Amino acid sequence: MSSLRLLISDSYDPWFNLAVEECIFRQMSPDQRVLFLWRNADTVVIGRAQNPWKECNTRRMEQDGVKLARRSSGGGAVFHDLGNTCFTFMAGKPGYDKTISTQIILNALASLGIQATASGRNDLVVINGEDERKVSGSAYKETKDRGFHHGTLLLNADLSRLADYLNPDPKKLQAKGITSVRSRVTNLVELLPGIDHEKIRTAIEQAFFAYYDEQVSAEVISPQSLPNLPGFTEQFAKQSSWEWNFGQAPAFSHVVDTRFTWGGIELHFDVLHGAIDRCQIFTDSLNPTPLEALAQRLQGAAYRPDAIDKICQHWIDDFPELQTELQQACHWLVEVLR
């Protein structure tokens, strides 16, 4: 039986691909060496210890239909579209060695005429003109008996969209968690016009086979054609859940404020595990009672716009004589938290 395994995903769903990756990693034989190749449609992928509200413009992502996906490895936030090729190398220990997988990617690029080098924070860089530019970023995960190295290659990504989604709104947010380091990047198409996913995928496959002097047939994975992956349904449910993608954020505080014709309001939130642990409201309104009641209602609520909107609607029902003013406040609060 071959020690190599090659898997290719036909799905562009980040939650599907990350669930497949996690299941294969848990269930692989310790003597196997696995290469998994995949792509995600519009997605921001964050590291295991990151805070999405700090890293991302969550409101813009929701407006544009961009998914958020938290991976199980560390590292920073990245934007994926179909101009990226994603790779994952897995191996049991002591065979797992991220320098080997890095070399395979470098060999694949060299076979296409692209000279890249490993640099700094798990990056691959090229010289573009007089500048050194990043074309690949990676992250890693290790357990007692195995490890994986996964990353992306920028082929023809829409780099203008990085700034749209990887910069948070200018909110008054004091947050713990790992902050992404922004790098100067370039697409491989700038160096090799005509490069596409199929070409780079084939080059990586061939470099993988050449390194280990062995070839295997690819297993193509899709939602309609899953390999035997016990626990996949549960893992996909986790990867796609708000509780994992948002609720795993480290504790943080958030202050929002605005002014209406009837008075100004300022809300202080302490958020823990994606829920409002403490809420304080300050106001110069002549009738602060409804706002004090809102602060009490928000205690313990999930820190997500739909949950807060539902609470606000019940709150408004308690003060029918102030419906217009409280609807204003509700609409503002739900929008500012997106």
Curated annotation (Swiss-Prot):
Q: Where in the cell is it found?
A: Cytoplasm
For this protein, the record's CDD domains field holds:
LplA (cd16443)
* Signal sequence segment: none
Q: Which SUPFAM superfamilies match?
A: Class II aaRS and biotin synthetases, SufE/NifU
Q: Which HAMAP family match?
A: LplA
Q: Which family does it belong to?
A: Belongs to the LplA family.
Predominant location: cytoplasm
EC main group: ligase
Q: Which reaction does it catalyse?
A: L-lysyl-[lipoyl-carrier protein] + (R)-lipoate + ATP = N(6)-[(R)-lipoyl]-L-lysyl-[lipoyl-carrier protein] + AMP + diphosphate + H(+)
> What function does the entry list?
Catalyzes both the ATP-dependent activation of exogenously supplied lipoate to lipoyl-AMP and the transfer of the activated lipoyl onto the lipoyl domains of lipoate-dependent enzymes.
GO cellular component annotations, sorted alphabetically?
cytosol
Q: Which GO biological-process labels does this protein carry?
A: protein modification process
Q: Anything else the record notes?
A: In the transfer reaction, the free carboxyl group of lipoic acid is attached via an amide linkage to the epsilon-amino group of a specific lysine residue of lipoyl domains of lipoate-dependent enzymes.
Its annotated pathway?
Protein modification; protein lipoylation via exogenous pathway; protein N(6)-(lipoyl)lysine from lipoate: step 1/2; Protein modification; protein lipoylation via exogenous pathway; protein N(6)-(lipoyl)lysine from lipoate: step 2/2
Q: What is its EC number?
A: 6.3.1.20
What this protein is called in its record is: Lipoate-protein ligase A
Task: Indicate which residues the UniProt annotation says bind ATP.
Answer: 71, 76-79, 134
Annotated ranges, domain BPL/LPL catalytic: 29-216
Assembly = Monomer.
UniProt KW keywords:
ATP-binding, Cytoplasm, Ligase, Nucleotide-binding
List the InterPro entries hit by this protein, alphabetically: aa-tRNA-synth_II/BPL/LPL, BPL_LPL_catalytic, Lipoate_ligase_A, Lipoate_protein_ligase_C, LipoylTrfase_LipoateP_Ligase
